[in-house]
Each structure stands twice: as structure tokens, then as C-alpha cells.
């Protein structure tokens, strides 16, 4: 990543700078940058620095402090050769860190010894970091070189929640020099029963693991003490990516190549069976789980490339689902057609739709049109043909009267709805296509509706709906003459 640098200006070139920096410049010169003095008729003079001078990384700096504010803090340890605050290349925003180089190596050693994790600057939660920059650590400055943090930082779990940092230090100090000891706490300030301990060397950390991991059970802990190396940044990133991939797989099963569809569909149906089993035990399924179950049911209804999905068995409150086998269906009728798109049938392979699944013996109620009485019911009303009473068994009992049906669908040859019925959707995942859009908006008619009421209902329910790491933005399509001033 390219980082824009903002470099310290050591003051204007005037008489004061002459006495402070010892470098001559005329009163009319433009300024003094990084120890360079400029005179109208003289070449620039570069201050000397030791051949083994150390470039320091400074972290945990308040973002409102620039070079001139930081200079007095570091000047007391020696003459500064260069001080640079890191800023974002595009936004120019302060990154909260800087690079510092002294003219003399000893000045860097003194600054690190006096400041590193010894002082917390105003507005910061952690003490200032003063250590060699990565390039220096890989180079010849061996006296300041340290092993990577992940090789000597330990995660400690199953602690007594009453233990403090001092208690943890006493437990681990027998194995070496402890640089950091931090107990993880919740928003209320109470301990979570785990901590991070950083040693000065990898060997010390390994010795602590060998001696303490599983060696004892702390009072109030459910199992023995856990001592292991903390996850690296790369491992944490990989775990987050796996979680994101799992979310995308749940909300976008159509993105999976159809060559391996059979095994994937079978796994989906196993997940659906588990969801429905939980319904049978608890009698209620939250809206997100109901939506996931509906997608699984739709996937089961697809018969792509001659591959048959695994059969689904209805689950009741007091029985275990038996195994059912059914022949593949070569073709499935298409009961729903919207704007030329073929709808997804609710049944496949002779299996009953999810209305046949009972929750603790509660029989399904007829699905109703969305009403203003329950916003969540509006959002998932169209899913009821698949999720049935599993989503809202209580709401079905309260709403028993019939509601008028919406006007008939627009003719298939019309590709765009009338004014006020067309939606513009932002932030869709790149792999989304027509099939995914239809699957997502089918409960409301489709993206292009035949009446403004359905369009407004879809906007209220789906605007802000999260898919993976994206949130949908749904709004009315602008009229064609919206940009005209008259």
C-alpha cells in the first residue's frame, strides 16, 4: 500500500531557527524542512546522522497531533533527523502513527527505553509504541530486534473471572519476562475469563505453554486452564473470510456451480431438516431462519441439468423423520410466471411443501396478505408458502379474516412496470443474476410491480436487508423527466 507522507517542517527560517538548529538561513528564505536550510544563494545543507541510525515506528498517536506537536516530546532525547506522520494517500487523514529518525543511534535507544509503553498520550486508550520500524528489525540493528509478536504472545483461557492482571502476572512470571498482560473484559468491565500474555522471547512463551496448559482448573472455571499461542493476523483474517463465505453460501446457493449441485442440495436439505426439527421442539422459528428454510425449499424444488435434489421429510413434534426415497422428476410445472420469468415451484419429487411441516402439532393456517399490523410479517409474507406456520404460528391465529387480492399481474410482454412501480437496487453482490433477484423479491411480486402499494411494501421490507457483507438499498426508480428543471 502506498502511504502519503507529511514531513516535519522544523519552523520558519528566521533568527530563532538559526539559534535552535545551528543551521544558517536568511530571513527571507522559504522555510526549513527535515533539517534542511535553504538560503537564496547557498546550496542546501543536510544534517549528518550516524551510519547505524535507527528508524523508529511511533504508534498510538492522537490523530489531532501533527509533526510540530510531536517534536517537543521527542527532542529531549536527541536531535531529530526526520519525523514523518503517516497519512492516507487519498483522504489525507491522519493514521495515528509516524516514523522517527534521530541523528544519533543513542538517541533512538533512549527514546525507546523511556517511552515505549511507558506513557499514554491524551485521548488514547493504550500507551505509546516506540520501536524499530519493520525494515530496521529485519536489518542489522540486532540490539533492538525482537521476535514477531505472534511468536511470543499467548492466549490464556478458563481463568477465574475474579483474577486481575497482577494475579495472571504472578502465575506466568516464573517462565520469563512479561511485556504485556491484558485481561479481556466486556462492556460492563467484568472479566471474560481470558487474557493475553506477551513474553520477550518465543522460548519463554513455549515454556509457559508446556508447564501450564491443562495443568490446573481455576475456581469457577468449567474446564482446565488453556494456554496457547494467540492467533496471528493472517489466521484471524482467514477465519473472517470463512465466515463471510459461509454467509454468502447460505444466502446465495445459486452461485454454486451446478456440476456439484447434488451434494450441495443434499447438505441444504439436511440443514433444513435440522431447522424444522428445532421448530418441532420450540414451536417458533425466527424470521431469518424461516427465510433460510424457504431458500432451501426452493433449492430442493429445482431440477437443474437432470440432477434431483435430496428428498425432504416432514417433521412432527413427536416423531423422527424416516428416510424417504423418490425418483427424479424430469420436468416440473411452473405455476408462477412474472414478467416472463418462470417461478420456483413449491414441490419437487412428490414431496409436500413446507406447509405440511407441523410445529408441535399446530396445523398450518392459510397465508394472508401483508398487513400493517406486523412489519416482520410483511417482510416474510411471501415466504409463508414455503415456511408456512413455522415462521409465525401465533400471528396466524390472530389474523383470520380474508383480505382482498392485489390486482392481476401485468402482461408478460411488458418488461417494465408503470410509473412509480419500478425499483432501483444498489449493492447487490456481483454474482447475483435474474434468478437470485426473482428469488429475493418474489414475495412482493417482483422488482417491477404492477401497483405502487406493492412497490412501497417491498421498499419498507427489503431496504437495508443484509446479504453477506452488503446491505440492499431499495428505492423507487426515478422518473425519466426527474432531471428536467420544468
UniProtKB/Swiss-Prot annotation:
RRM domain ranges (all copies): 54-135, 152-232, 406-479
The keyword Oxidoreductase belongs to this UniProt entry's keyword annotation: no
Annotated GO CC locations: cytoplasm; nucleoplasm; nucleus; postsynapse
Protein name according to UniProt: CUGBP Elav-like family member 4
Organism, scientific name: Mus musculus
Stated role: RNA-binding protein implicated in the regulation of pre-mRNA alternative splicing. Mediates exon inclusion and/or exclusion in pre-mRNA that are subject to tissue-specific and developmentally regulated alternative splicing. Specifically activates exon 5 inclusion of cardiac isoforms of TNNT2 during heart remodeling at the juvenile to adult transition. Promotes exclusion of both the smooth muscle (SM) and non-muscle (NM) exons in actinin pre-mRNAs. Activates the splicing of MAPT/Tau exon 10.
Segments of this protein annotated with the region Disordered: 18-39, 121-149
Cited InterPro entries: CELF3/4/5/6_RRM1 (IPR034648), Nucleotide-bd_a/b_plait_sf (IPR012677), RBD_domain_sf (IPR035979), RRM_dom (IPR000504)
Necessary for TNNT2 exon 5 inclusion as annotated region, ranges: 239-258
UniProt keyword Membrane, yes or no: no
Region spans: Sufficient for RNA-binding and MSE-dependent splicing activity: 1-298
One Gene Ontology term of the molecular function aspect: BRE binding
Tissue/organ expression: Expressed strongly in skeletal muscle, heart and adipose tissue (at protein level). Expressed in the brain and cerebellum.
Amino acid at each position: 500500500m502506498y502511504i502519503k507522507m507529511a514531513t516535519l517542517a522544523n519552523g520558519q527560517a528566521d533568527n530563532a531557527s538559526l539559534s535552535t538548529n545551528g543551521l544558517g538561513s536568511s530571513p527571507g528564505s522559504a522555510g526549513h524542512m527535515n533539517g534542511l536550510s535553504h538560503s537564496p544563494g547557498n546550496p542546501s545543507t543536510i544534517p549528518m546522522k550516524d551510519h547505524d541510525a535507527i528508524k523508529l515506528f511511533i504508534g498510538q498517536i492522537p490523530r489531532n497531533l501533527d509533526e510540530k506537536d510531536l517534536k517537543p516530546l521527542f527532542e529531549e532525547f536527541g536531535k531529530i533527523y526526520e519525523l514523518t506522520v503517516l497519512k492516507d494517500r487519498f483522504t489525507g487523514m491522519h493514521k495515528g502513527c509516524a516514523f522517527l529518525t534521530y541523528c544519533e543511534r543513542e538517541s533512538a535507544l533512549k527514546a525507546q527505553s523511556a517511552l515505549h509503553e511507558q506513557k499514554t498520550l491524551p485521548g488514547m486508550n493504550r500507551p505509546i509504541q516506540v520501536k524499530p520500524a519493520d525494515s530496521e528489525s529485519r536489518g542489522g540493528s540486532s540490539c533492538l530486534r525482537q521476535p514477531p509478536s505472534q511468536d511470543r504472545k499467548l492466549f490464556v483461557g478458563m481463568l477465574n473471572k475474579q483474577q486481575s492482571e497482577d494475579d495472571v502476572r504472578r502465575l506466568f512470571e516464573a517462565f520469563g519476562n512479561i511485556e504485556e498482560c491484558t485481561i479481556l473484559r466486556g462492556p460492563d468491565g467484568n472479566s471474560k475469563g481470558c487474557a493475553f500474555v506477551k513474553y520477550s522471547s518465543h522460548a519463554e512463551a513455549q515454556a509457559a505453554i508446556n508447564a501450564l496448559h491443562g495443568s490446573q482448573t481455576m475456581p469457577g472455571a468449567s474446564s482446565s486452564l488453556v494456554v496457547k499461542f494467540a492467533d496471528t493476523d493472517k489466521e484471524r483474517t482467514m477465519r473472517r473470510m470463512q465466515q463471510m463465505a459461509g454467509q454468502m453460501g447460505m444466502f446465495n446457493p445459486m452461485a454454486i456451480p451446478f456440476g456439484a449441485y447434488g451434494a450441495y442440495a443434499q447438505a441444504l436439505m439436511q440443514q433444513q431438516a435440522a431447522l424444522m426439527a428445532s421448530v418441532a421442539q420450540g414451536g417458533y422459528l425466527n424470521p431469518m431462519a424461516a427465510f433460510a428454510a424457504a431458500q432451501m425449499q426452493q433449492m430442493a424444488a429445482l431440477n437443474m441439468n437432470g440432477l434431483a435434489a435430496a428428498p425432504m421429510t416432514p417433521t412432527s413434534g413427536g416423531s423422527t423423520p424416516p428416510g424417504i426415497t423418490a425418483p427424479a422428476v424430469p420436468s416440473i410445472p411452473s405455476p408462477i410466471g412474472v414478467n416472463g420469468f418462470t417461478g420456483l415451484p413449491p414441490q419437487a419429487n412428490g414431496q409436500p411443501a413446507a406447509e405440511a411441516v407441523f410445529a408441535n402439532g399446530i396445523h398450518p393456517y392459510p397465508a394472508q396478505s401483508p398487513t400493517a399490523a406486523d412489519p416482520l410479517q410483511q417482510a416474510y409474507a411471501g415466504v409463508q408458502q414455503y415456511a408456512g406456520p413455522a415462521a409465525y404460528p401465533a400471528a396466524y391465529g390472530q389474523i383470520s379474516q380474508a383480505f382482498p387480492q392485489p390486482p392481476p399481474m401485468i402482461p408478460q410482454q411488458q418488461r417494465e412496470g408503470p410509473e412509480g412501480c419500478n425499483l432501483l437496487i444498489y449493492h447487490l453482490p456481483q454474482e447475483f443474476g435474474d434468478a437470485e433477484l426473482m428469488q429475493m423479491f418474489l414475495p412482493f411480486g417482483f422488482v417491477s410491480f404492477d401497483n405502487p402499494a406493492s412497490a412501497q411494501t417491498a421498499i419498507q421490507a427489503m431496504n437495508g436487508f443484509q446479504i453477506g457483507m452488503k446491505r440492499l438499498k431499495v428505492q423507487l426508480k426515478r422518473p425519466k423527466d426527474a432531471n428536467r428543471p420544468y
